[in-house]
Amino acid sequence: FNTLNSISTLVLLKQSETANAMLTRLSSFLRHTLVTQPGGKVTVAQEMETLQLYLGIEQMRFEERLRSDFRVEPDAAKAQLPAMLLQPLVENAIKYGVSPQEEGAEIAIVAQVVGPRLRVTVSDTGPGMTMNNIEAGLPAVRPTHARRDSTGVGLANIRDRLAQAYGEEHRFEIRSPESGGFSVLIELPFETEESAALSEATAEPAQAAPPKKPSAPSAVVTSTLPPKAHQTT
């Protein structure tokens, strides 16, 4: 909605070229997101492409106030994660990190492979938020004026998606030092498209096999012959 409002304002100001450029980027972003199946997974590379399209739109609104830094390891780029998992985090970073500050903020997205796991961190250099304590799952937080309750709702939704997809095999942490800034760390089991397809292929035969009919009990023959006598010469 913010993007549409910005386009409307540009049209009213007769800045048609800028409005057309923003509309084109918005169209590309929406097309990119609509081809993804709901609840499906994408590679980290695809998720980063989506984020770059989204940030390209926001860049036209905030200009030099919005700075981004993508750091993705080659192996991490192949890993899979739930589609559109990171976009709400970037949106929060813009709304509560970039927007409130005159100088804006930098948003960093880092993806790396740590042992058998994928680790993704989304952070910003905004005003941050205070935290009461950190629990095993979603930390209990007390938003400041800069980060209202909507942030907690967005984070809770992401946590719930991770719990549904990975159970206890995921890690979700919020960090906000007193000096400012805000970051969310996510860890998932490392999985590529190939390994996921292989897992599905090995699971399908067992699921597709029809239940076996109970066979008739086999007859049990008990020998009643006496033991064979030893021959004597």
Where are these regions (language model features)?
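C-terminal end segment of the histidine kinase catalytic
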Residues: S176-T233
